[in-house]
């Protein structure tokens, strides 16, 4: 009789654990990520923010730029390639050479690696 009750209890427990495991809050942004967020908002978001247009997004959203093996252009999704595209420009993207120093570029990359998440309150 006990074993008949144990299985449903274990199933309910497993479902609850899995449900709450997905409810974690985002950890706070590091100082570098927060600086990158500010740079993104000031210099990138006005072109790369998501919108509700039914058109193909040009320029692309950067929310998951490092979640894929390649960038929207088909080149590898690496820090070096993103740095190159930002500083040299590519296609319709203008060059930002001279607008980011090395520390700022590293901060922007750190923020892009977060998937553009918000910090926990």
Model-based region annotation:
Residues 24-29, 51-55, 72, 114-121:
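Inter-heme linker and motif-flanking segments adjacent to c-type heme-binding CXXCH motifs
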Residues 33-37, 49-84:
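Gly/Gly-Pro-rich "capping" loops immediately C-terminal to redox-active cysteine motifs
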Residues 86, 92, 97-121:
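C-terminal capping alpha-helices of c-type cytochrome domains
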Residues 45, 63, 94:
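Cys/His/Pro-rich metal-binding microdomains
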Residues 36-50, 108, 112:
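The canonical Cys-X-X-Cys-His
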């Amino acid at each position: 009789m006990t074993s008949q009750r144990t299985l449903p209890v274990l199933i309910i427990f497993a479902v609850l654990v899995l449900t709450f495991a997905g409810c974690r809050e985002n950890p706070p942004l590091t100082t570098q990520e927060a600086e990158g967020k500010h740079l993104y908002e000031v210099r990138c978001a006005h072109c790369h923010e998501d919108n509700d247009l039914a058109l193909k997004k040009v320029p692309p959203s950067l929310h998951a730029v490092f979640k894929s093996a390649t960038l929207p252009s088909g080149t590898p999704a690496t820090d070096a390639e993103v740095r190159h595209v930002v500083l040299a420009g590519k296609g319709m993207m203008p060059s930002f050479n001279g607008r980011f120093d090395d520390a700022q570029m590293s901060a922007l990359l750190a923020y892009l690696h977060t998937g553009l998440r918000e910090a926990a309150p």
